[in-house]
From Swiss-Prot:
CDD domains to which the protein is assigned, alphabetical: Ubl_ATG12
Protein name as annotated: Autophagy protein 12-like
GO cellular component labels: Atg12-Atg5-Atg16 complex; autophagosome membrane; phagophore assembly site membrane
Role, per record: Required for autophagy.
Record gene name: Atg12
Keywords, ordered alphabetically: Autophagy, Cytoplasm, Isopeptide bond, Ubl conjugation pathway
Stretch list, region Disordered: 1-22
Subunit structure: Conjugated to autophagy protein 5-like.
Keyword Manganese: no
Biased composition (Polar residues): 1-18
GO biological process: autophagosome assembly; autophagosome maturation; autophagy; autophagy of mitochondrion; cellular response to starvation; glycophagy; larval midgut cell programmed cell death; macroautophagy
């Protein structure tokens, strides 16, 4: 599947787009857990209508993992959201200090 300009722009660094200023995107903080490679840019902005599954796919591609490897996401080190969960809903319920904190790993850690 080829990357489209829309998919490339959907997840960006927190200080790069003017859309951040009008609040149309949600700031997420990605923290590595376990034996997964660390993403140096921890803070990203995401379209609020994206799903957890989309973020998992993005991380998988960004880290250039093998097709057999999985990525698990956890909200605030407590639970694994469903892949079809909308980021906006997670942010409204579990966002702190203007960010949604997500932990990613290659094996199950919590929940």
């Amino acid at each position: 599947m080829a990357e489209t300009p829309e998919s490339q722009a959907a997840l960006s660094t927190s200080s790069s787009t003017p859309a951040d200023k009008d609040g149309s995107k949600i700031c997420i903080l990605l923290n590595a857990t376990g034996n997964v490679p660390i993403i140096k840019k921890r803070t990203w902005t995401v379209d609020p209508n994206k799903t957890v599954g989309w973020i998992q796919t993005f991380i998988h591609k960004f880290l250039k993992l093998d097709a057999s490897e999985q990525i698990f996401l956890y909200v605030n080190q407590t639970f694994a959201p469903a892949p079809d969960q909308i980021i906006k809903n997670l942010y409204e319920c579990h966002g702190t200090n203007g960010k949604l904190v997500l932990y990613y790993c290659k094996n199950q850690a919590w929940g």
